[in-house]
Amino acid sequence: MAAATMALSSPALAGKAAAKVFGEGRITMRKSAAKPKPAASGSPWYGADRVLYLGPLSGEPPSYLTGEFPGDYGWDTAGLSADPETFAKNRELEVIHSRWAMLGALGCVFPELLARNGVKFGEAVWFKAGSQIFSEGGLDYLGNPSLIHAQSILAIWAVQVVLMGAVEGYRIAGGPLGEVVDPLYPGGSFDPLGLADDPEAFAELKVKEIKNGRLAMFSMFGFFVQAIVTGKGPLENLADHLADPVNNNAWAYATNFVPGK
């Protein structure tokens, strides 16, 4: 699902002219990615004096990492950001994947948390919940048959592609008239709380988003590994570890794991 949506997230439209014809007149609009507004000079997250990946022990950052964008700690050992076009593409992919990962991590943990506190709504373990659609009775959203009773995986896939693709297409295209300049931070209807109204606060929120997003991507990777190795959800694994940390830890599972058992 994420792959289908990410296919719609390409920045290839940025910088290209879009022409619309009304009657005999022609209106041409050009959308280009906006350069971020400079953060406050005292911000520790931007500029040449920003915090680097190893603090005072960090070496000189590459010349192309200037601290202009959020999450730039001056570390690029593989030189992945040396090419400006590649950097722009990877930056967009990272932000989008970060947002997906934050939503996914919450979705993995929250149902288990509710179930462990007495809330009954069907299967709570994230990697088992979706498989209920293949059962004879199908899948009830939140365990309630009066909400959405799903019986076709193809129907769910089609609905998600249409709805999520429409939102992503709207974001990338800059709205119906191309008025949104930066597809990564479109604002407007995507910012109903007005969090981007203050430029300095918005610059700091961008840093918080990318930092939490990177942690969430690592978390999701850990959840996948746990599901394969233990066959349990993240909270159940945490409870097992706290109850018996000697026998329930990464090292113990890594040295005793046998695929298929």
Curated annotation (Swiss-Prot):
Residues that coordinate or bind chlorophyll b 1: 53
Amino-acid positions noted as binding chlorophyll b 2 in the UniProt annotation, renumbered to this chain: 99, 148, 177
Annotated transmembrane regions: 95-115, 147-167, 215-235
Binding site residues for chlorophyll b 5: 160, 257
Keyword Glycoprotein: no
Residues the record lists as binding chlorophyll a 1: 75, 81, 94, 214
Transit peptide start-stop: 1-29
Entry binding sites for chlorophyll a 2: 97
InterPro entries recorded: Chloro_AB-bd_pln, Chloroa_b-bind
Name of this protein: Chlorophyll a-b binding protein 2, chloroplastic
